[in-house]
Amino acid sequence: MKKKKAAPHSRFNTARKISIFWTLFIGIGAVGGAVTMLVDPSGGLMGMDAMLPYFKKLPFADVLFTDFVFSGIALLIVNGITNLIAAALLFAKKKSGAVCSMIFGITLMLWICIQFYMFPFNFMSTSFFIFGFLQAATGYAAVIFYNQEHFVINEENYKNIGSDPTRLVVFFS
């Protein structure tokens, strides 16, 4: 009986699966939060109505932040739909999904930096800043691992390999 040769372990697939978790976790959460903000712009449904005065620190607060409609739309676009698109690309095993995961992790950290400016210290903002960092880090790792696993050496491009024993040729992946 012949044994099947095991497929080599793919670090890209491991990082890709972790990135899928982060993009779905953040994307679905953002869509849920955005829908709730759009259904109840006062913020009462999520217990956020007391947070609205903190938005007065932002530019155009008297126009954009009288309720949570603009915040809901921004959350849906910036953190919701984008992360779900990244998850779809990661499911398709595309390198662009890993790049998007990294970028959207950084975007989440920037989003949370605005919250650090607006709100007093709180567990939720700090947690999501860490989640953004972890998403960016796993996205970056997936990009690196993808590049390493798809690195190709074509010796025909290096015609003089072995012709001069005094010359050292080094390949980098």
Cite the ranges covered by each PLM segment:
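Topology signature of small-to-medium multi-pass alpha-helical membrane proteins
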Residues: 2-173
